[in-house]
């Protein structure tokens, strides 16, 4: 490992310690699963009302909605998970190399997300039209599925914990078993060519999210004889986001999760439970709420989504292209940048000259456009934007600390040149 690489690894470790979870990891592991149940129960049985009561009997009634696992849900999920794993391993797609590991080696990854995504949609569509699968099954089985996937992830994380105990030198567990169970012990656990972290990060959770949305739309149609404009907006926006994700799938290889985070309960549960079951809250809510939107409202929400997308994708692609070719023209002029002592270039024009994370800003605009179609009858569809804002604020701080540790003076110079973190003139 070069001197530079060991400095980078030391910076990652330092930042991880500062922006890690402290002791809150235990609280998260205990509190988050009930929170997902809570939101689902509020949306499904209480018309989206946030239930708070001091009446113990009312709470007992509330929690009695937690659904036990069923063989039906377990069978569905097993078929789903194994089917997606088979696609990850065997579906056609280019093989690309991941980022350098701490020992200097690189892993191969099969980038077949878009094929798997479209193939899955075609198969599900075929099964539904032939009458072998009910279009509303994911809505009807949502409660049992939530329990099944929760149980699965807790067990799977146990498997991952033991898997990593004999891992590489840089993967040594901390010796605090519950913490290691939460954070994971292996960076890239693999069964044959199946990279479990990359697979769970994208496939069984993200494609499931889209299918759940479609199932919600089908249920709305079954119950009310219509699929409303707000439902079409939510399903359309989120489908577009997912297609875009799979088209640019390779970008996931440079994310913090793939580069630095071990694969334990946190990522596993986040990918398989949190993502599909909370990112569908808007569609879940709309199943029982068939309000319309004024035309100006629809235009404003679509405009917000498209503007957010243009910023989010524009900023990410601009950085990607610039890092490959610093002589590129950015917004009609030669790119301006700071050359760091480490040799990395920091773009200071285009989106990266307006704020240091315009890509987060664009992502937040998109997230808000997913919530607004639900109108203002319940706070639950807005849960996503609240959570996502907290997530990205935390990420920005962590990334800033990481870049400061890596680039020192050069980063301070960039911060001076581009003072806004995420939102120009505001934050
Ligand atoms: N939907 C979700 O759940 C979710 C969650 C998280 C993130 N995201 C999205 O994923 C996308 C990527 O996010 P990310 O967290 O990986 O952050 P990012 O902004 O894509 O990457 C930050 C890294 O880029 C480099 N960099 C920073 N400033 C630069 C500049 N001016 N010029 C060139 N390089 C610069 C630095 O790394 P090096 O110098 O070391 O290369 C820095 O660590 C974002 O659009 C974000 O909104 C989505």
Curated annotation (Swiss-Prot):
The name this protein carries in UniProt is Delta(14)-sterol reductase
Positions on the Periplasmic side per record topology: 47-70, 132-141, 219-226, 284-291, 378
- GO biological process annotation, one example: sterol biosynthetic process
Q: Which UniProt keywords apply?
A: Cell inner membrane, Cell membrane, Lipid biosynthesis, Lipid metabolism, Membrane, NADP, Nucleotide-binding, Oxidoreductase, Steroid biosynthesis, Steroid metabolism, Sterol biosynthesis, Sterol metabolism, Transmembrane, Transmembrane helix
Protein topology in the membrane = Multi-pass membrane protein
Protein's UniProt keywords contain Lipid metabolism: yes
Q: What is the effect of changing residue 407 to A?
A: Loss of catalytic activity
Segments spanning the bilayer are 26-46, 71-91, 111-131, 142-162, 198-218, 227-247, 263-283, 292-312, 357-377, 379-399
Q: What is its EC number?
A: 1.3.1.70
Superkingdom field? Bacteria
The residues that the entry says bind NADP(+) are 319, 323, 347, 352, 359-360, 399, 403-407, 414
Where primarily located?
Answer: membrane
MF terms per GO, please? Answer: Delta14-sterol reductase activity; NADP binding
Q: Which reaction does it catalyse?
A: 4,4-dimethyl-5alpha-cholesta-8,24-dien-3beta-ol + NADP(+) = 4,4-dimethyl-5alpha-cholesta-8,14,24-trien-3beta-ol + NADPH + H(+)
| Positions on the Cytoplasmic side per record topology | 1-25, 92-110, 163-197, 248-262, 313-356, 400-427
Compartments, record wording: Cell inner membrane
Which family does the entry's similarity section mention? Belongs to the ERG4/ERG24 family.
Q: Which pathway does it operate in? A: Steroid biosynthesis; zymosterol biosynthesis; zymosterol from lanosterol
Organism listed in the record: Methylotuvimicrobium alcaliphilum (strain DSM 19304 / NCIMB 14124 / VKM B-2133 / 20Z)
InterPro entries in the cross-refs: ERG24_DHCR-like, Sterol_reductase_CS
What changing residue 359 to A does, per the record, is:
Loss of catalytic activity
Q: Name one GO cellular component term.
A: plasma membrane
């Amino acid at each position: 490992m070069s001197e530079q690489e060991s400095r980078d690894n030391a910076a990652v470790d330092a930042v991880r310690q500062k922006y890690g979870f402290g002791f809150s990891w235990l609280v998260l592991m205990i509190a988050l699963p009930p929170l997902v149940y809570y939101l689902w129960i509020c949306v499904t049985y209480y018309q989206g009302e946030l239930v708070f009561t001091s009446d113990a009997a009312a709470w007992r009634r509330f929690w009695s909605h937690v659904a036990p696992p069923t063989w039906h849900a377990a069978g569905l999920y097993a078929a789903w998970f194994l089917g997606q794993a088979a696609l990850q391993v065997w579906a056609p797609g280019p093989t690309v190399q991941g980022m350098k590991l701490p020992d200097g080696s690189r892993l191969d990854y099969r980038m077949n997300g878009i094929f798997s995504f479209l193939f899955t949609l075609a198969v599900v569509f075929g099964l539904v039209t032939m009458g072998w699968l009910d279009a509303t099954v994911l809505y009807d089985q949502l409660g049992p599925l939530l329990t099944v996937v929760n149980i699965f992830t807790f067990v799977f994380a146990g498997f991952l914990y033991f898997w990593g105990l004999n891992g590489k030198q840089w993967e040594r567990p901390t010796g605090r078993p519950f913490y290691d169970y939460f954070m994971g012990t292996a960076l890239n656990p693999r069964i044959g060519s199946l990279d479990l972290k990359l697979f769970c990060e994208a496939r069984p959770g993200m494609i499931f999210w889209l299918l759940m949305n479609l199932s919600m739309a089908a249920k709305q149609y079954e119950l009310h004889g219509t699929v409303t404009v707000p439902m079409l907006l939510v399903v359309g926006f989120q489908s577009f986001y997912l297609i875009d994700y799979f088209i640019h799938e390779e970008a996931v290889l440079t994310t913090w999760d793939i580069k630095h985070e071990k694969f334990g309960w946190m990522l596993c549960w986040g990918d398989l439970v949190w993502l599909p079951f909370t990112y569908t809250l808007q569609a879940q809510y709309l199943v029982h709420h068939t309000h319309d939107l004024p035309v100006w409202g629809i235009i404003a929400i679509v405009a917000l989504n498209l503007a957010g997308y243009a910023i989010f994708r524009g900023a990410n692609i601009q950085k990607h292209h610039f890092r490959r070719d610093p002589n590129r023209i950015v917004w009609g002029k030669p790119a301006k940048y700071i050359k760091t002592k480490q040799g990395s270039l920091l773009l200071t024009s285009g989106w990266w000259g307006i704020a240091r994370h315009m890509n987060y800003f664009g992502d937040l605009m998109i997230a808000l456009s997913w919530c607004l179609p639900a109108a203002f009858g319940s706070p639950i569809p807005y849960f996503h934007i609240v959570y996502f804002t907290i997530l990205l604020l935390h990420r920005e701080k962590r990334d800033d600390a990481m870049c400061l540790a890596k680039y020192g003076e050069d980063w301070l110079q960039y911060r001076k040149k581009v003072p806004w973190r995420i939102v120009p003139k505001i934050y």
